[in-house]
Amino acid sequence: AILDADLVKSVPPAITADTVMDVFTHALEACVSTDRSDFSTALAEKSIELVGVFLLRAYLDGNDTHARQKMHSASCLAGLAFNSASLGLNHGMAHQLGAKFHIPHGRANAMLLPHIIEFNSDINKHSKSQKEYLPAVKRYATVAQILGLSSYNEIMTVRSLVNWVQFMLKEMDIPLSISQMGTISEEEYFNAIDSMADAALEESLICVDRKEGIHILN
């Protein structure tokens, strides 16, 4: 990879925002992948550490070459990580949103990410005890801690990660939902949900049934 910050000084803020969120999604999915290894996890966690420090700096100032160089490194590390560990549900869904509605790939990933974290960790099932939550909770909690987030238990720490992602999207003017984009009608979107879910499930990286896929896209 050619990691030269001077080549991306003129990249507009909106494209920077989409790109850095794609980097973060790459690293996060590699971290929680069931195919992860010690080596891929080390690369992904370092990428997340760099993103946490330099994401907003790179977005706010294209001339901050140090921040852009660090985000280049984060991108490369995340790429090496997911090349080994693979990606997951977030990318499977984002590919379909991009193909159907021409949403930039990083932006589609960013809008989906809070919902995918909640789905993978199952933290919205209030009736469960701490021990019954999915193994992804521990991995997401680790990611949150790398970003400097913490709470009194792992479940609340994962919630802090969801809040962090949503905060970053707001700071970078990325819509939190399809409806906030204002370019896709509600009817058009809901008519496409079934076909997008079916297409996402055809990807080998998806381990979710059709009903769950439709629920997430709703």
Regions found by a protein language model. Give the residues of each.
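A glycine/threonine-rich phosphate-anchoring loop and its flanking beta-alpha core
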Residues: 1-36, 135-142
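Residues on a specific face of well-ordered alpha-helices
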Residues: 18, 22, 26, 45-49, ...
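Glycine-rich phosphate/diphosphate-binding loops and the adjacent beta-loop-alpha structural elements
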Residues: 30-84, 95-98
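Short coil/turn segments at secondary-structure boundaries
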Residues: 66, 156, 179-182, 208-213
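Glycine-rich phosphate/pyrophosphate-binding beta-alpha loops
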Residues: 76-109, 202-205
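Gly/Pro-rich interdomain helix-loop hinge
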Residues: 103, 107-188
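Short, amphipathic C-terminal "tail helix"
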Residues: 187-218
